[in-house]
């Protein structure tokens, strides 16, 4: 699993002109899944992201987590993160989970996130989404599980 974790001032996901997920101050997480991913990977990723200390404390140090700042969490599935771009001029997606497995993994991630973090929103697996964000910092991390 590959995730792009972004600290945002605000973010939203639109599908066909309708907003389906929106947060203010918090984290936008783009998620790409591999065939080897499991529920254990998802639990580990979610725990790390929610508790990752990337928000500033009163002295300006990155010392607070999403939980500490009571921020929003916006989860967006993005299979293109798994693209193999090493050869040629067209990406290969052979490293990505199948659509069925990817949907199952994303649904599991969303269910777990909603149970452990009240302000959780999401995009829609398989949809053509427009993602809008104001990256805060910018603070962006690439995490692999």
Swiss-Prot record:
The keyword tRNA-binding applies. It comes from the Bacteria. GO terms for biological process: D-amino acid catabolic process. It is found in: Cytoplasm. InterPro entries: Daa-tRNA_deacyls_DTD, DTD-like_sf. A motif (Gly-cisPro motif, important for rejection of L-amino acids) lies at residues 137-138. Its main location: cytoplasm. SUPFAM superfamilies: DTD-like (SSF69500). Its EC number is 3.1.1.96. Keywords: Cytoplasm, Hydrolase, RNA-binding, tRNA-binding. The keyword Calcium does not apply. One of its GO terms (cellular component) is cytoplasm. It catalyses: glycyl-tRNA(Ala) + H2O = tRNA(Ala) + glycine + H(+); a D-aminoacyl-tRNA + H2O = a tRNA + a D-alpha-amino acid + H(+). One of its GO terms (molecular function) is Gly-tRNA(Ala) deacylase activity. NCBIfam families: D-aminoacyl-tRNA deacylase (TIGR00256). Homodimer. A Gly-cisPro motif from one monomer fits into the active site of the other monomer to allow specific chiral rejection of L-amino acids. An aminoacyl-tRNA editing enzyme that deacylates mischarged D-aminoacyl-tRNAs. Also deacylates mischarged glycyl-tRNA(Ala), protecting cells against glycine mischarging by AlaRS. Acts via tRNA-based rather than protein-based catalysis; rejects L-amino acids rather than detecting D-amino acids in the active site. By recycling D-aminoacyl-tRNA to D-amino acids and free tRNA molecules, this enzyme counteracts the toxicity associated with the formation of D-aminoacyl-tRNA entities in vivo and helps enforce protein L-homochirality. HAMAP family: Deacylase_Dtd (MF_00518). Belongs to the DTD family. This is D-aminoacyl-tRNA deacylase. The lineage of its organism: Bacteria, Pseudomonadati, Pseudomonadota, Gammaproteobacteria, Legionellales.
């Amino acid at each position: 699993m590959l995730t792009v974790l972004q600290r945002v001032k605000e973010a939203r996901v639109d599908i066909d002109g309708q907003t389906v997920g929106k947060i203010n101050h918090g984290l936008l997480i783009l998620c790409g899944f591999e065939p080897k991913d499991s529920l254990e990977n998802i639990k580990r990723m979610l725990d790390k992201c929610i508790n990752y200390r990337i928000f500033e404390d009163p002295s300006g140090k990155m010392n607070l987590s999403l939980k500490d700042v009571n921020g929003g969490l916006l989860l967006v599935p993005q299979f293109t993160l798994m693209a193999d771009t090493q050869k040629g001029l067209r990406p290969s997606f052979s490293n990505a989970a199948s659509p069925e497995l990817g949907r199952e993994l994303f649904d599991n991630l969303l269910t777990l996130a909603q149970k452990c973090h009240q302000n959780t929103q999401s995009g829609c697996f398989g949809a053509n989404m427009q993602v809008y964000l104001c990256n805060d910092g910018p603070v962006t991390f690439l995490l692999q599980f």
